[in-house]
């Protein structure tokens, strides 16, 4: 009887552990409204991200600054200046 309880408890713990980490991410082709990919030039990296991108776009005369973005999942992430 004791081994049956242990076996059932282990089985339930395994089922619970397997069901918890549900990290499925569904990608969609939804566009961010008001975000333009027309002026994307510099490739973003660990050292060059949103702060640097925004500053460079403001210096270049883009009123809304800029942000790193990509129009598709396999596409490279670039600094996109916004008008």
Swiss-Prot record:
Disulfide-bond pairs as recorded: 40-81, 44-68, 53-79, 57-80
GO biological process terms on file: defense response to fungus; killing of cells of another organism
Chief location bin: secreted
One Gene Ontology cellular component annotation held by this UniProt entry: extracellular region
Record bears the keyword Signal: yes
Signal as UniProt keyword: yes
Keywords on record: Antimicrobial, Disulfide bond, Fungicide, Plant defense, Secreted, Signal
Subcellular location per the Swiss-Prot or TrEMBL entry: Secreted
Family the UniProt entry places it in: Belongs to the DEFL family.
UniProt-recorded name of the protein: Defensin-like protein 47
Species assigned in the record: Arabidopsis thaliana (Mouse-ear cress)
Lineage of origin: Eukaryota, Viridiplantae, Streptophyta, Embryophyta, Tracheophyta
């Amino acid at each position: 009887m004791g081994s049956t309880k242990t076996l059932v408890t282990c089985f339930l713990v395994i089922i619970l552990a397997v069901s918890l980490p549900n990290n499925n991410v569904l990608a969609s082709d939804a566009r961010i409204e008001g975000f333009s990919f027309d002026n994307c030039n510099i490739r973003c990296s660990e050292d060059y991200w949103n702060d640097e991108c925004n500053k460079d776009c403001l210096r270049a005369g883009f009123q809304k600054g800029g942000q790193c973005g990509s129009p598709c999942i396999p596409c490279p992430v670039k600094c996109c200046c916004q008008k």
